[in-house]
Amino acid sequence: MKTVCAKDMCAGCMACINMCKKSAITIVDDYKTYNAVIDEVKCVNCGLCEKICPNVKCVEQVNPIFWKEGWALNPEIRSNASSGGIASSIIYSFIKNGGYVASCMLNKGEFVFELTNSTQRAEQFVGSKYVKSNPKTIYIDIERKLQEGKKVLFVGLPCQVAALKNFSRNQDNLYTVDLICHG
């Protein structure tokens, strides 16, 4: 079995699926691990999947602009959130200032990512999600908005942020928030 990265080392960011134009990659998901399996019949050996995989190509180490901790001042936001509501406050502020936000939400029994510029829709992003999530086509959706000159905030796990940075060619209007990973 040929895989994008070393067997049982796949973080499940799914960027390789978004990048592959030949639909040659399937994610094999078992209880503990993901594996990005390459269909060698469909694969044309372009190497794009490996170029964006954060386990194969490390993202350039950049010092954070700043490092903060805190909580929402709004008691309603704080009480609805799992960890003080800081992510919700950042998300709502970003949208109110004309940006789009991509983050994980529960939709029809599945944890998926969505891109929105609606604070009402962004309410679905609230809460900790200590589960595997499926970014599906979020990297493509974000890249389209960035190409349109829109500002986009991505809130996700470090592996997903790294995958997005490897995937995106237009990072001038890309903002990211890495959440602590418990996986």
Question: What do the predicted segments below correspond to?
Answer:
Residues 41-42:
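Short, charged amphipathic alpha-helical surface segments
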Residues 54, 60-183:
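Iron-sulfur-associated redox domains of electron-transfer enzymes in respiratory
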Residues 12, 45, 153-154:
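Conserved SAM-binding loop
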Residues 12, 32-34, 84-85, 99:
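Glycine-centered flexibility motif
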Residues 2-4, 9, 15-37, 47-64:
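Iron-sulfur cluster-binding cysteine motifs and their immediate structural context
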